[in-house]
Amino acid sequence: MGKIKIAVLLSGTGRTLDNFVEKIKKGDLKAEIVCVAASRTDCLGLKKAEKYGIPCAGFDIKDHKALSDEINKFVFKFNPDLIVLAGFMKMYYVPENYRFKVVNIHPALIPSFSGKGYYGMRVHKAVSESGVKVSGCTVHFVNERYDEGLIIAQKCVPVYAKDTPDDIAKRVFEAECKLYPQVINLFAENSIEVKNNKVYIKGE
């Protein structure tokens, strides 16, 4: 299995970037992070990318379409195979030539607790208040609507009555740290196929 070239888009602390770097070092993620782009110039994730020696750039642009355009100008210099959203808190407009080459991870089991306004701790607070017994994370393709792209993979975690939103968040992030690299590896293996508006994984 060859390495896949990925561009990482982020807005916050870069926890998922940390996870990717760690997994790559261990040989558990068959990827090369060719660049990092951030929707802010002051976020910790950007500083981490600099520390890791990864080419990076931040953009303070309010308009989502204009932001996507500027990010794409930067990202396309590195010709990534896959664009990976990792805590990217803006709408990203996918270029036509990158259809089914842009993925995101959501901290719940889509279609539950998803869509505009459901991000970060808001998701886990809603899960806690709902009384559901299962939550998890979802890796999906990015399209023109928040969290509505085709689902690629999901991982469940239990939710207990005594859980706080922080408890749920911790458990879900642990699941994310496993699932996201697994899905990226599937792309590296050319094991993902889209047919009839569904995602098929070879061998399943």
Where is each model-derived feature located?
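One-carbon transfer enzymes
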Residues: 1-204
